[in-house]
Design a protein with these regions (language model features):
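Helix N-cap at the beta1-alpha1 junction of Rossmann-like dinucleotide-binding domains, i.e.
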Residues: 29-30, 71, 94
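Mid-domain Rossmann-like dinucleotide-binding core that forms the NAD(H)/NADP(H) cofactor-binding site
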Residues: 1-48
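Helix-to-beta-strand junctions that scaffold the AdoMet/dcAdoMet cofactor pocket
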Residues: 81-82
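N-terminal Rossmann-like NAD(P) cofactor-binding module of classical short-chain dehydrogenase/reductase
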Residues: 62-65
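Short glycine-/small-residue-rich Rossmann-like dinucleotide-binding loops
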Residues: 48, 68-69, 91-92
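Short amphipathic alpha-helix with an adjacent loop that forms part of the alpha/beta core around
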Residues: 49-59
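C-terminal hydrophobic helical "lid"/dimerization subdomain
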Residues: 17, 75, 119-177
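Rossmann-fold dehydrogenase core element
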Residues: 86-88, 99-139
Length: 177
C-alpha cells in the first residue's frame, strides 16, 4: 500500500483482513506505528530506504495499490513488483509518472488505473467493513467551515477523511483523529 492517507489507511485494513501480507509504504518514521496499528506487517519509510528495493528484499509485490497522488513516488514502484505484478493507481497524480519500460517488459509487470467500483462492489466493501470492523479515521470540521475543509482537502492537507458535522453532532460512530 503506497500512501497511508484517506484511501491508504482503509486499504491497509482491507488487505490485512483479506489475509494478504501487507506492506505499507510512506514517508517518515512517525507513520510506522499507525501503519502497523492499522494492520501492516511491514512499514517501508521512503525517507530512509528505496521502496522498490525493500519490496524486492521481501520477494517482490504481487500488487501495489498506489493511493498517494505522486507520480514521482509511483513510477519507481514498478521495480518493486514481482514477476507479473500489478501497480494499481487510484490516487491521481498531477505530474506524469516517470518509469523505465524494462521492468514492465522483462517481468511481465503491468500498471492499471481504477476510479471506483460498481454499486455491487461498493455494497460488498461496506458489508466486509462491517463484518471485519474496518472503520475510517476522520477529521471533523463544523459545517460552517466547509469551504476551509474543502480547501485543505484540495491542497492535500487533510488527514484521512474530512467529515462535515452539524451542531447536533452528525458523524457519530467513526474513529476521530
Amino acid at each position: 500500500m503506497q500512501g497511508i492517507g484517506g484511501l491508504g489507511h482503509l486499504g491497509i485494513q482491507f488487505a490485512r483482513h483479506m489475509g494478504f501480507r501487507t506492506v505499507a509504504i510512506g514517508r517518515g518514521g512517525e507513520k510506522e506505528k499507525l501503519a502497523k496499528d492499522l494492520g501492516a506487517h511491514v512499514y517501508v519509510d521512503t525517507a530512509v530506504e528505496d521502496a522498490a528495493a525493500a519490496l524486492q528484499r521481501l520477494g517482490g509485490a504481487r500488487a501495489i495499490l498506489a493511493t498517494a497522488p505522486s507520480g514521482d513516488a509511483m513510477g519507481p514502484l514498478v521495480s518493486g513488483l514481482g514477476a507479473r505484478g500489478k501497480l494499481i493507481v487510484v490516487g491521481v497524480p498531477l505530474e506524469p509518472m516517470q518509469l523505465s519500460a524494462f521492468p514492465l517488459v522483462f517481468g511481465g509487470r503491468s500498471i492499471y488505473g481504477s476510479l471506483a467500483g460498481t454499486a455491487i462492489e461498493t455494497e460488498d466493501a461496506l458489508a466486509f467493513s462491517v463484518l471485519e470492523n474496518i472503520r475510517p479515521m476522520i477529521e471533523t470540521v463544523p459545517l460552517e467551515r466547509a469551504a476551509e475543509a474543502y480547501d485543505r482537502m484540495i491542497k492535500g492537507k487533510a488527514r484521512f477523511r474530512m467529515v462535515l458535522v452539524t451542531k447536533d453532532g452528525a458523524a457519530q460512530g467513526a474513529t476521530v483523529n
